[in-house]
Amino acid sequence: MRHGNGLRKLNRTSSHRLAMLRNMSNSLLEHEVIKTTLPKAKELRMVVEPLITLGKKDNLANRRLAFNRTRDRDIVTKLFTELGPRYATRPGGYLRILKFGFRHGDNAPMALVELVDRPEVEETAVVAE
């Protein structure tokens, strides 16, 4: 039975919550790592993981479903050309949520949300001489 398995409301209206989760999922799929609060991160996982599962099988119906959920052509392209093949053999668990301390001001628990197996980017430090 699925009693009590509803969504977190996050103190927002349903339209605001939908828009916020859509924006956060687009940012995560574009940058592959974002920083947010822990409850938002846990809700974001319920949105992004099915999207990546859609991206594993590239057909027109799945592309239309992904566009309906993201409303961004560039994200849909990346989802089906990069992320789908990257996670083709992984049966779920595409996100990693790391606790990241507490926010100054309201002491909200923060978290880093990142895609598992993302390519490491070498950061070049700019040295001022």
Curated annotation (Swiss-Prot):
It holds the Pfam family Ribosomal_L17. One of its GO terms (molecular function) is structural constituent of ribosome. Keywords: Ribonucleoprotein, Ribosomal protein. InterPro entries: Ribosomal_bL17, Ribosomal_bL17_CS, Ribosomal_bL17_sf. Gene3D superfamilies: Ribosomal protein L17 (3.90.1030.10). GO terms for biological process: translation. The keyword Ligase does not apply. The keyword DNA-binding does not apply. One of its GO terms (cellular component) is cytosolic large ribosomal subunit. Part of the 50S ribosomal subunit. Contacts protein L32. PANTHER family: LARGE RIBOSOMAL SUBUNIT PROTEIN BL17M, RIBOSOMAL PROTEIN L17. Belongs to the bacterial ribosomal protein bL17 family. HAMAP family: Ribosomal_bL17. This is Large ribosomal subunit protein bL17. The gene is rplQ.
